[in-house]
Every structure is written in structure tokens, then in C-alpha cells.
Amino acid sequence: MKFTKSLLLLIVAVFASSNAAETFSNFQVTNSDANSPCVTTPVELKVNTCQSACGSILNVLPVTGSTSKFTFNQFGAQDTKCAATPTSSNEFTCVDGKSKVAIGTTTYSVVCVPDKTNSSESDSSDSTRIGASFALAASVLLSMLAI
């Protein structure tokens, strides 16, 4: 009986935490360099897509096993297809939605844009509310199991 309760508790905890996680596949990037073409206008980068942005060739790659950690890569201007090793890179985490990412001699401001899982969702706070709902349901179930 104790094993069954423990197993149920584990399943509920995993389910609640997995539903609260946000995923990202788009990033708005600006550059601190005054000569950059994207100082005032953010450029939107997509995951795993090489793009000419901020005067450089950039791409963002997810870190295996994480929905919020990414490697931000900068390539030489001549390497338009990102076929070679990046000239510089830096791993960053989307925590508060915004990160300063220094790669090479440049510091980029990266705004992580949460994926929309449902067209009726208006912003990232919806996914937070969904996660909170699952957490509440999990605590109710836990209290029932304790009785």
C-alpha cells in the first residue's frame, strides 16, 4: 500500500511540474553595439535557423534535455549557412524572459518569446495559471491520499 501511494505521489508531482514548464522557439535580439543594424529594432531569431542579424550571422540551439537553456552562436559574416564552427558562443537560460548574452566582444539582449500551445492563450501568464491549476489539483490529491 505504501508503494502504491508513493508511486501515485511521484506521478502527480511529475505531471504537475511538466505542465508548468514553458518552451521557447523564438527570441527577440538586440545588440549593444551602436553600429549594429538592430540596436533600436529587435530582430526575431528562430531556434536552429541561421540568420543574418545585428551585423553578424547568428543562431540559437536548444540544449539537450532542457526547454529553457539555449546556446547562442555567432558565426563569421562569410559563413552565411553556419557550415563551420561558430566564432563564439554562449549558453543562456530563459528564466525571467530576458537575458544579457555576451558572445565574443558583443553583448546581446535576448528576450525569450514563450511558445503558444493554444491559440486562445493571450500571453505567458496563461501557462503560469495552467501550471498553478495543476499544482493545486496535485495538492488536493496529495491531501486525499494522506487521509
UniProtKB/Swiss-Prot annotation:
Main location: membrane
GO molecular function, one term: actin filament binding
Propeptide residues according to the Swiss-Prot or TrEMBL record: 119-147
Coiled-coil ranges from the UniProt annotation: none
Glycan attachment points: N118
Similarity comment: family membership: Belongs to the ponticulin family.
Protein name: Ponticulin-like protein C1
Species this protein is from: Dictyostelium discoideum (Social amoeba)
Name of the gene encoding the protein in the UniProt record: ponC1
